[in-house]
Amino acid sequence: KSLSEYDWLGLNYNYADIEISDVQVPTIYLKNETRTTSRISPSFIRDTRDNFMNPSSGSRHVVRLDLAGLGGTKFHKASYEGSHYWPIIGKLVGMVHGEIAWADGYAADSLPAFERYYMGGPKSLRGYQIRNVGPKDSLGNPLGGNQSLLLNLELQYPFTKGLRGFAFYDRGQLYGGGNDTSTTATTWDLAKMRDSIGAGVRFLSPFGPVGFAYGVKLDKATGETDGEFHFSAGNSF
C-alpha cells in the first residue's frame, strides 16, 4: 500500500513445503528434512532515489519482519537494509549500503537451514565465493548464520547514460550457526568480519542491469583464492 510518493507498506503471506535431500554428512544444523512453513511478512519501504536504475542522489530503506508459526515450523526474522547515494564532484557518485539481519526459532523449533542467512558473491560480500562466508562444518561446507552484518561502499562514475564504472570496499560476516571454522563468534563481533576491495562495471542491457566485478580479499585465509570474478543481473543494492 502506498502511503505517499516515497513510502510503502507491504504485507505478504507465504506457505511452502520444503525438502532438503542428498546431504552426504548430516549434522544437527544441516540434514535431510522436510519442513512446512506458513509465514506472514510485514514490511516498510522508503525510497527517495532520483533514479531506480542509476541513482545519483537519495536513499532507500527497507524494514522487514517475518513470523512463521501459523502452522509448521516456528521462527521469526527481522532485517533492515539501507542505501544512500550522493554526488561528490562532477559526475562522481558515492554510495553506502548496509544490512543487518537476525533470525531464530522459537517454541522449541530450530531455525531451518534454508532460512539461515548466507553471504558471499556479487550481491553481498564481493571477492568471496557465493555463500562461502561465515560458519562452516568440519568439512568446510557453509552452514549459514542466524545473524548477518554487511557494509558496502562504492565510488561510481557514469561513463555514459547506461554504463557506470565503480570501485568498492565490502565488509561483512555471519554469526551463529554452530561449529565454525572461519570465525569462532556466535554473536556480533566487529573484529571478526571479512573485507574486500575491487572494481567493476554495470550497464543497462535490453534485459535489465548487468554487472561484472572483480574483488580481492583483504584477509585471505589459508586455502582461499586471492579474489573472485562476479557476474550479476538486476540491481545490486
Language model feature labels by segment:
Residues S2-W8:
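Secretory-pathway-linked proteins and extracytosolic
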Residues L11-G162, A167-T186, G223, S236:
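C-terminal outer-membrane beta-barrel translocator/porin domains of Gram-negative envelope proteins
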Residues S41-F44, V201-V210, D226-F237:
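Outer-membrane beta-barrel "beta-signal"
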Residues G82, I197-A199, A233:
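Extended, hydrophobic alpha-helical segments in both membrane/secreted and soluble proteins
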Residues G121, G127, S196-G200, G208:
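Glycine-centered small-residue hotspots that permit tight backbone geometry or close packing
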Residues Y157, Q173-Y175, V201-P209, V216:
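Short leucine-rich amphipathic alpha-helical surface patches
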Residues G165-F168, P209-G215:
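Conserved active-site loop/cleft motifs that coordinate metal ions or position small ligands
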Residues D180-G200:
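A short alpha/beta connector and helix-capping loop motif
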